């Protein structure tokens, strides 16, 4: 039953295709009815020859030309064929033959009638040897191509490229060799001097930290600002209890007794005693968890009172010409975030 179903379905499908307008109505062959059975090749051959004969007849009626014999039809018709020279026909309509990579045009044909229309079928077997014989009759095309190919690879461009390539490395070598040796000796002494300069201040700074209060630069610049920051946190009661005369009198007497001045011109012993007093006061005052800083409640009031008293002492020092012009004056407010390493070391 399976084969019968396929047979019926295939037949109905072919009928639908044949009845559609897309395909022309033609005689249905037996090959469609025997797809799943033995094929009759003789019958298929006869149907093919019949179809080709119908196509040839249609072409002859349309062009009045016999494409099988490659001659126009005799007798009156819609089209009149006339003989013309092959050179007058555009190259597009001429027959060509390809030899290797070149395509050559065939010469005039031996038959007397020239055709200006492209034939449907290929040339007959008799014309093949004529075309082969006529192809070698045009030798100028082959030697012309050979002559053109010969001058393309001459030996002249090779030395030209060599000459151009030779001076290029010479120029680059000269350009690279000149500047490179010059900066090398210049850079070495600079680096050596810089290294020496860097090593000297490092040693001096280390010695200054170990010696303590001997160098005047450290005492004149860093400790003053550090003292100012820590003194801003000093409580008011302790400053009120201390007599102001001692602060002003002790440094003056000691200055007259032992005037030891260094680069900044400030007495060293006075600063040492001030730092010792500050250390004792910092030990007595209440701390907020950070060394050198008071509790957050008394910071603002103590700072204002301290700066007011500090300004008076600065005026007295200026009147007595104790502070040289180049050194920072004590009445200047301490910088924000200044270093506090020296006082902390001494407190410890």
Swiss-Prot record:
Residues 115-348 are annotated as: Disordered. One of its GO terms (biological process) is digestive system development. Keywords: Cell cycle, Methylation, Nucleus, Protein kinase inhibitor. Disulfide bonds: none annotated. The keyword Nucleus applies. It is found in: Nucleus. One of its GO terms (cellular component) is nucleus. The modification Omega-N-methylarginine is found at residue 109. Expressed in the heart, brain, lung, skeletal muscle, kidney, pancreas and testis. High levels are seen in the placenta while low levels are seen in the liver. InterPro entries: CDI_dom, CDI_dom_sf. Residues 275-284 have a biased composition (Basic and acidic residues). A motif (Nuclear localization signal) lies at residues 309-312. Residues 207-220, 227-274 have a biased composition (Acidic residues). GO terms for molecular function: cyclin-dependent protein serine/threonine kinase inhibitor activity; protein-containing complex binding. The keyword Manganese does not apply. Its main location: nucleus. Potent tight-binding inhibitor of several G1 cyclin/CDK complexes (cyclin E-CDK2, cyclin D2-CDK4, and cyclin A-CDK2) and, to lesser extent, of the mitotic cyclin B-CDC2. Negative regulator of cell proliferation. May play a role in maintenance of the non-proliferative state throughout life. Belongs to the CDI family. Interacts with PCNA. This is Cyclin-dependent kinase inhibitor 1C. It comes from Mus musculus.
